[in-house]
Amino acid sequence: AAFFNMCRPLELVFANGMDKGVQVGIQTGDVTKMNTFDEFYDAYKKQMEYCISLMVNADNAIDVAHAERCPLPFLASMVDDCLTRGLTAEQGGAVYNFTGPQGFGIANMADSLYAIRKLVYEDKKVSMETYKEALAWNYDKGLDEKSVADMSEMILKGMQDAGMTVNEDTAKAVLQTVMRLKPSDEQIQKFTELHDMIDEVPKFGNAIDDVDYFARDVAYTYTRPLQKYHNPRGGQFHAGLYPVSANVPLGGQTGATPDGRYAHTPVADGVSPSAGKDVNGPTAAATSVSRLDHFIVSNGTLFNQKFHPSALAGREGLEKFVALIRTYFDQKGMHMQFNVVDRATLIDAQKHPEKYSHLVVRVAGYSAL
């Protein structure tokens, strides 16, 4: 299996397939010259399909390596049909031989696509040039430490490719130069205004049809292409939509996104709304998530909800909680899980873990003690 960050293909759209000076995606054209939203969205879908093909190739290469170099005979003794066939699980001896890569970032993509369609193509409040510039500068925040390091590395690589001598002094000089780069006051004002406009645009997780449509469709751009692929064990690829906790470190490798998310911050968790963007209550959030096509996500989904203990206190609180769960599954949701703990407790537990041996925090398929 693998983790698939659905924000990365959109980064490649804005960079015409380039990443840190390297052509890692396909060329989908200059984003500032895409005259319609459909043209922009098609570019995202093309980058998505190409990135999926890269992931499948990597997954299958690892499968072959495991079969040839790392067979696990003890595991085979406990997996149905391996002994009968005389093959380990890695060699295709199991009854079921699926590969299940997990995608995440649906909320970021739904919010990003909706914001771009509305602000750039429908209301024409901002140009795509300004949007692209704002993402490059991380909106009003400017370049963070990782962006500085990445840009310096790209410049040094370009110098080496051009035949220039690069040494420690050169690297220091480039780093210091990049660190001094800052957006102008005019740019900061422009990017702040854009970020404020993005904040006002409706977000996934509030039972708003148009935004929820994008979430459902973005999920399809990941799940449907995977269905045509098979692994060396003879099994089919089955999509999942859950990150465990990979949305945090992989978000740390992802630049700013058009939904207003700042560079190198966590990507949305599983099929859950982006943090703090579901402002119409838990029932609305559950309604939005239930509008995804859960039937095609045969490897599972992850929907996290968090409650303050007071929200579920007493019989009335418990009855509302039960009603929420029943409603979600009546609407064909697949999975939901909960944390019922207040922020102060979590912060204190970080400082004094010895006082909280009883504290359980649900993560994804497991709970942390």
Task: Explain the meaning of each model-derived region.
Residues 52, 56-69, 83, 87-91, ...:
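Internal maturation/activation junctions in enzymes
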